[in-house]
């Protein structure tokens, strides 16, 4: 399996405890980090929309309807990092981080031999934008 792996990036004082190959978040200049906006950032915030499920659904539609969809194969075998807390001791019933959306889209694109144009067309018709 060559799908990306999602991690929560973190530091302990000046030491990086968990890093990633590709940062997928918004700009962060706190806690010793100096991270620019990632092209993969989720423009929708929980503060604005109320829940991780809602912002992940919006992110799914955003990615599916953008040219960024065609860049998803570049995440092959990468460790992607975000700030989202991983649910611990909870049953996960939906996406808790937009990184999960990227991983599932990657797996779908991989399953269909990386034909991003075909998959994007199908997803747009089924879920959002055509």
UniProtKB/Swiss-Prot annotation:
This is Uncharacterized protein R718. Pfam families: DUF4326. It comes from Acanthamoeba polyphaga mimivirus (APMV). InterPro entries: DUF4326.
């Amino acid at each position: 399996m060559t799908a990306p792996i999602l991690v929560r990036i973190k530091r302990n004082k000046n030491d990086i405890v968990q890093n990633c190959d590709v940062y997928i978040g918004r700009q962060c200049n706190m806690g010793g980090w100096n991270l620019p906006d990632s092209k993969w950032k989720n423009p929708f915030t929980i503060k604005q929309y109320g829940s991780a499920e809602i912002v992940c659904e919006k992110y799914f539609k955003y990615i599916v309807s953008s040219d960024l969809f065609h860049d998803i194969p570049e995440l092959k075998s990468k460790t992607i990092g975000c700030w989202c807390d991983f649910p611990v001791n909870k049953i996960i019933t939906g996406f808790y981080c937009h990184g999960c959306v990227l991983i599932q889209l990657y797996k779908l694109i991989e399953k269909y031999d990386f034909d991003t144009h075909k998959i994007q067309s199908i997803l747009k018709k089924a879920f959002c934008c055509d």
